[in-house]
């Protein structure tokens, strides 16, 4: 299950972008949040002209699973 509600409703690149930025708010330090926000913006800009629906869905699925992994890594209870 995704740490941020709404992952299953992500259908478009813009929805993915907003979802990933919301995920950044859960990271522990401000520097880490800024780093991942920048990476998300860069990735969005590099894929904004993608028009193949299958490729877009593949990118969305991969980005959500990567975000889940990162959040689980940095927000584990010790």
Curated annotation (Swiss-Prot):
CDD domains: Complex1_LYR_LYRM9 (cd20269). Belongs to the complex I LYR family. LYRM9 subfamily. Pfam families: Complex1_LYR. This is LYR motif-containing protein 9. Transmembrane segments: none annotated. InterPro entries: Complex1_LYR_dom, Complex1_LYR_LYRM9, Complex_I_LYR. Coiled coil: none annotated. It comes from Danio rerio.
């Amino acid at each position: 299950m995704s740490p941020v509600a709404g992952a299953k409703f992500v259908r478009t690149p813009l929805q993915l972008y907003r979802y990933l930025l919301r995920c950044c708010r859960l990271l522990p330090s401000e520097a880490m949040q800024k780093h991942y926000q920048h990476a998300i913006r860069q990735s969005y800009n590099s894929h904004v002209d993608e028009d193949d629906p299958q490729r877009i869905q593949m990118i969305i699925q991969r980005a959500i699973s990567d975000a889940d992994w990162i959040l689980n890594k940095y927000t584990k209870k010790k």
